[in-house]
């Protein structure tokens, strides 16, 4: 959000029309990996989540 605010502020300083920021739905990627590096033992798993946030800002 801070980056969007900085872009909008800079555009308004240059007297540009600004539309946005429009929030695009967050994309969530789930990654499942084995905890054991050697592959032996009990099957235990780690779940990691990667979130991608996107914004669209139109400068006219």
UniProtKB/Swiss-Prot annotation:
Keywords: Ribonucleoprotein, Ribosomal protein. InterPro entries: Ribosomal_uS10, Ribosomal_uS10_dom, Ribosomal_uS10_dom_sf. It holds the Pfam family Ribosomal_S10. One of its GO terms (cellular component) is cytosolic small ribosomal subunit. It comes from the Eukaryota. GO terms for molecular function: structural constituent of ribosome. The keyword Ribonucleoprotein applies. Signal peptide: none annotated. GO terms for biological process: translation. PANTHER family: 30S RIBOSOMAL PROTEIN S10 FAMILY MEMBER. This is Small ribosomal subunit protein uS10.
């Amino acid at each position: 959000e801070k980056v969007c605010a900085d872009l909008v502020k800079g555009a308004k300083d240059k007297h540009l029309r600004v539309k946005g920021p429009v929030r695009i739905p967050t994309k969530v990627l789930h990654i499942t990996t084995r905890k054991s590096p050697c592959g032996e033992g009990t099957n235990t798993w780690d779940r990691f989540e990667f979130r991608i946030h996107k914004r669209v800002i139109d400068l006219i």
